[in-house]
Structures are given as structure tokens and as C-alpha cells.
Amino acid sequence: MPANSWPDNDSYKELDPLNSLLSDVSTTEESVVETRDLSLPSRFQGRRGKAALVLTIVWSGTIALHLVSWGSIFILGLTTVLGIHALGVVFARPRHYQKEIQGSLPFVSILVAAKNEEAVIAKLAKNLCNLEYPNGQYEVWIIDDNSTDKTPHILAELAKEYDKLKVLRRSAQATGGKSGALNQVLPLTQGEIIAVFDADAQVASDMLLHVVPLFQREKVGAVQVRKAIANAKENFWTKGQMAEMSLDIWFQQQRTALGGIGELRGNGQFVRRQALDSCGGWNEETITDDLDLTFRLHLDKWDIECLFYPAVQEEGVTTAIALWHQRNRWAEGGYQRYLDYWDLILKNRMGTRKTWDMLMFMLTMYILPTAAIPDLLMALTRHRPPMLGPVTGLSVTMSVVGMFAGLRRIRQEQKFQVHTPFVLLLQTMRGTLYMLHWLVVMSSTTARMSFRPKRLKWVKTVHTGTGE
């Protein structure tokens, strides 16, 4: 595909398809590739330079705020702006979705990219082949990405048992990782709606009946369902991830209700084929295809809805090291898209509400953790409190409020579970303590991206099939 940038004209009707942002260059999933700028299309060149520039601006700006007389006034003003936006998010009323389809049900293609998933792939395949949706109206494609374990044999046997199950095996020379696998199978699919699940997913039998009606609104380009942790009771890390997912989906629904952006989370994402085609498929130049696709859909004037119920369950990582690898990948991919599409964001291609929401999110999620280090160093040097204290306090407060509200909303959906406010508060406090790891992850990631050559590295999460 050509690597041309967006046209200068801002008219929606005159926009070129977003597939012009992508290229045919790709990298293998498990190898570490030092990416030279000259090998990338123009939009993805210079990521390290962009990251270094942002880091320099953030550090110098933070230091300057400690040295000027009006620094504290500026921070209070920033906190006020963020606080007003936060109040809007908290009090926004989530949309009520139409639950019934008017007319015939659309055809759905379900895609799963799998590599060495012998422990979980059979359970998922049987799960997906027995969903509550009319026979002949959906298909299941599992892409075996050159597995070296028993995955190919398991899939071959299951394909004999289920007519709707189709298997595509990729060669050892295939490139692009998960994005490459999804792009390779896409031309073979028939669905108007494309669903993507991870190999460890556990899908509610009525999932399609809840999700498909949301696509009746023509502007909806994708839907993300809530992710739940199947092994949440295992240890501190999995319990923390459970609370984190409740916070994430609550923020997602509140942001979309306010006119902001909804985001894809990979597992449990549903994309309208028309929207996916207009964006050029999945980007093989990123380590987080879902986060990248989120931006490209919104830049192409599509909306993304987020659904609390039903949830797709997945295995949470169980060790601090596994969590560190996973969250560093998420942080790098999330930050990288701002570097890739910054000019289109500033041109307000998404619309004012979405652009404002995205900038507020970037400021809180990426810029504030990056600024925390020079702020702390200056505070220690000058024997003064950290300048960013008010903004940090607001961010922590929003996290606590959102996590409690998210956990409460989940319990309301699951009417058979009754948890007292005290139990929810304990879960929120534990989740808040767990969430502090993001401060270290974000600050280290933004610094690392400024100095080290870009590495398209994917560390496979091992799935054991132990989640209940």
C-alpha cells in the first residue's frame, strides 16, 4: 500500500482512505528488529526524534515552572481545566443502546490469531462455534501463525467437527505478527462485521446478540466489549488487573457519552468492514494494532462504542515481570500513536470534542508521569513541595472515583452478586495501589523511546487455560 500522508484539505468528503498511512513493510512477531527510519513510510519515520523533542519540552517546561514566579498559578489553572473536564466525565450519562435488530442480522466473521496456544485453543474454538447466532450468519477463522506445538493438529481435528470453523496456517516466512495475520485472512472473510478475539478469550454465548445492534447507528465503526480477568482471584496482580479493567471500561463509556473517544482493546473488538477497509486494515508498523486502529478510525470520522455487558474474559498475567513486559508494550504503543498522528490531531480531524478529550487523556496518562521526574528532582533540590501536586492529586482522585464506579456498575449488571460498598471500597483501594505501577511504566517508556532505536518487539503472553 502507498505510504502517502493525509491531504491538506480538511473536508471530510475529500479525505483519502486511511490505508494511505500504512505500508507493506512489516516485522516478525517474536524477533527484535532495530528499525531504521529510512525503512519506514514517512508518517512513521523519526519516532525517536519526536519522542526526544517531547521529552525535552516536558522536562525543560517543568523545570521552568519551578523557576518562574507564576509557576504555581499556571499549575492551579491547569488543574482547574482538567477538573472541569473530569467533572464532565463523571456526570456524563452513558448512552442507552438499542438491543434489537431492525431487519435481518448481518454476517459476522470472527478472527483469532494464534501461535503455540495448545492449552487454550480447543476451548475457544468450541466456544466460538456454539454462539447464539443464526447458523449461516457467522464464521470463525483461526489463523495459525506457524505454531510449533500441537495447535495445528488440534485445529485440524476441530475443523472436521465444525463446518463454520476455518483455519489458515501461515508460513515461517510470514511477517507482520498479529496485524499481518489478521490482514492476511481478511480478504477471505465474508462478514460485514469483523470480530477479533485473543486465543485465551472466554466469550459469552449471547455476545453477538448484544454487540451487533450497536452497529445500526451508521457512524459506529467499531465496538469494544469490557475485558474481564478470568483468574482474578489468583493473586495481588490479577486482582489489580480486575479493578483496572473496571476503571478502563467506566472511563471509556463516560468519555464516549461526553462526545470523547472510545478505544479498542484488542480482545473483544468488533469492527465494521467498511470502516476497516477505509483505514487500510491493521497497521503492521506498530506493536499495539488495536490502539493504532483506534486513532485511525476516529481520524476517519467513525465512532467507537464501549459495552459493559457482556464481557470477554481473558487470563491476567500473574507475575510482576510479565506485567512489566505487557504494560511497557501497551505504554509504548499508546504513546507512539501520538507521535505518528500528531499533525492530524492538531488539525482537529476528529472534531473538537474528540480532540479535546484525547489531549486531556494524553496530558494525564503520558505527559504528567513524564513530568513527575524533573518535578521531583527540582522539589528535592529547592526543598519545596512538588509543583505538580494538585494535578497529581486530581488524577489519583479520578482513578479512585472511576474504579469504584466501574466496580459498582459491574456488580449492578451481575445481579446475582451482591457486594457491599465496603467490599467495593477495599477493592478500589487495592486497585489504586496496584495502579501506581503505571507511573513507573509511563515515565520510563517515554524516556526510553527518546534514546533507544525503535524496537518492534512482542513478548508472548503464556496462556495456561486455568482461568475460570
From Swiss-Prot:
Main location: membrane
Keywords on record: Carbohydrate metabolism, Glycerol metabolism, Glycosyltransferase, Lipid biosynthesis, Lipid metabolism, Magnesium, Membrane, Transferase, Transmembrane, Transmembrane helix
SUPFAM superfamilies named among the record's database cross-references: Nucleotide-diphospho-sugar transferases (SSF53448)
GO biological process, one term: glycerol metabolic process
GO cellular component terms given for this protein: plasma membrane
EC number: 2.4.1.336
Coiled-coil residue windows: none
TM segment ranges: 51-71, 72-92, 358-378, 387-407
Cofactor dependency: Mg(2+)
Localization annotation: Membrane
Molecular-function annotations in GO: hexosyltransferase activity; magnesium ion binding
Tagged with keyword Lipid metabolism: yes
Catalytic reactions on record: a 1,2-diacyl-sn-glycerol + UDP-alpha-D-glucose = a 1,2-diacyl-3-O-(beta-D-glucopyranosyl)-sn-glycerol + UDP + H(+)
UniProt membrane topology term: Multi-pass membrane protein
UniProt enzyme class: transferase
Keyword Cell division assigned: no
Gene3D superfamilies membership: Spore Coat Polysaccharide Biosynthesis Protein SpsA, Chain A (3.90.550.10)
Function, as annotated: Glucosyltransferase involved in the biosynthesis of the non-bilayer-forming membrane lipid beta-monoglucosyldiacylglycerol which contributes to regulate the properties and stability of the membrane. Catalyzes the transfer of a glucosyl residue from UDP-Glc to diacylglycerol (DAG) acceptor to form the corresponding beta-glucosyl-DAG (1,2-diacyl-3-O-(beta-D-glucopyranosyl)-sn-glycerol). It can only use UDP-Glc as sugar donor. Two types of DAG (dipalmitoyl-DAG (DPDAG) and 1-oleoyl-2-palmitoyl-DAG (OPDAG)) can be used as sugar acceptors, but OPDAG is preferred.
Family assignment from sequence similarity: Belongs to the glycosyltransferase 2 family.
Official protein name in the record: Beta-monoglucosyldiacylglycerol synthase
Organism, as annotated: Nostoc sp. (strain PCC 7120 / SAG 25.82 / UTEX 2576)
